[in-house]
Amino acid sequence: MTTFRELGLSDSLLQSVESMGFEEATPIQAETIPHALQGKDIIGQAQTGTGKTAAFGLPLLDKVDTHKESVQGIVIAPTRELAIQVGEELYKIGKHKRVRILPIYGGQDINRQIRALKKHPHIIVGTPGRILDHINRKTLRLQNVETVVLDEADEMLNMGFIEDIEAILTDVPETHQTLLFSATMPDPIRRIAERFMTEPQHIKVKAKEVTMPNIQQFYLEVQEKKKFDVLTRLLDIQSPELAIVFGRTKRRVDELSEALNLRGYAAEGIHGDLTQAKRMSVLRKFKEGSIEVLVATDVAARGLDISGVTHVYNFDIPQDPESYVHRIGRTGRAGKKGIAMLFVTPRESGQLKNIERTTKRKMDRMDAPTLDEALEGQQRLIAEKLQNTIENENLAYYKRIAEEMLEENDSVTVVAAALKMMTKEPDTTPIALTSEPPVVARGGGSKKRGGNGGGYRDGNRNRSRDGRGGDGRNRDRNRDGRNRDGNRDRNRDGGNRGRRGEGQGRPGSSNGRGERKHHSRKPQA
């Protein structure tokens, strides 16, 4: 293994890294940092959880001249949660060097951001829409930027941000260094690399398994209309400490979180339509344990850094295998065990195979529990806890009352009563969820999700992003945009499913009038 001291980093950064408890670099860090410190462009292919933030963050921070009062680096991330997380990580790493980091994203007061920009941050971490908004307002100037980082570029493609990224890249000096990180390399991302990067070093970290071995993965074949009852039975049997349930759309998240509360579970949902304050409030309650189930869309959960998640339930199978990897990566962290459950409807078996091919791992099948099995499962879990208490706790204070009870009742009856009191009785509250269409795998895979991102610029970007899938089908995630003050960053998942194809620009057009705009670093042939 390579230590950070062997990578040629400055003393102030080494001090920060060591104070954070890190000594050895991960493979992506060991391969990326030396090339990046030399000023080379980098294409890094690595999954989440490989340490890629430090892989680009350390050389980015190393290059910053803190005596200059100008923006010297920008990191572009697909979601506000990831922007916040990356900003926090860079702050920790750059603390001893006193690098000023500023996250900017939609949903936050733009005037507050403008005031912060006037304090001359060295590095900006933000979502594409809000960065571009500040560029257009002349509140963010990039003439001194030396390094641009594109984090999770494939996800930004899926969310329709490609044109925004191109516009940002044309606004920075041509001599800038680009560090592009992406789990996959679809053609539009390759074209970005060809146009805006110079002889990039391609670094790919291969893993025998894409997903972590300490995550137990199961799938259950369940009919759409029976999924909710199966979910509640699993929650009763498994009694997770903290659980995340993934739904495919905002409507699903809203309905599912409400239904769980009706059945007596402490649950709340997060998705793109919630205000930033509301989302942060929900996450805080989840981290504190005042809610036990977090229901989320893929995009809303991107970048979440929550420790202690024991179970992930994929209530809806994801549109693409990469999203599955990101979903289950919320559990099984820091050496702890995690459990991931995937609900598969009869027509989704092909998508299950796609996921298994991507993860290079066969999932174990689990039968959906019946009502009787759910009750018995609860009782066995309670019995285990009772046995653990018998073996490890001091019970002297409780024995006198126990002995009095045994004088009047036999021991089996007493234990049975205790089990009954601690068992959650079946709740038959009627629940009606709106059915979601199945994800049917086509052509042996599901990675093709919509070309170059399409869409409009010049004020027309706020139209619906429904139906972007190339095959004319509604993509179910519905990336409907919002206004140009950056709030469209808020709503990249779910919503308004009926407006398929509305507001679609011609492929390659950028202003709603069919005029093509080329933003290329290379001379046009």
From Swiss-Prot:
GO terms for biological process: response to cold; RNA catabolic process. ATP binds at residues 46-53. One of its GO terms (molecular function) is ATP hydrolysis activity. It comes from the Bacteria. The keyword Cytoplasm applies. The keyword Mitochondrion does not apply. Its EC number is 3.6.4.13. Residues 428-525 are annotated as: Disordered. It is found in: Cytoplasm. It is an enzyme of class 3 (hydrolase). A motif (DEAD box) lies at residues 151-154. Gene3D superfamilies: P-loop containing nucleotide triphosphate hydrolases. Residues 458-503 have a biased composition (Basic and acidic residues). InterPro entries: DEAD/DEAH_box_helicase_dom, DEAD_box_RNA_helicases, DEAD_helicase_CshA, Helicase_ATP-bd, Helicase_C-like, P-loop_NTPase, RNA-helicase_DEAD-box_CS, RNA_helicase_DEAD_Q_motif. Belongs to the DEAD box helicase family. CshA subfamily. This is DEAD-box ATP-dependent RNA helicase CshA. It comes from Bacillus cereus (strain ATCC 10987 / NRS 248). The gene is cshA.
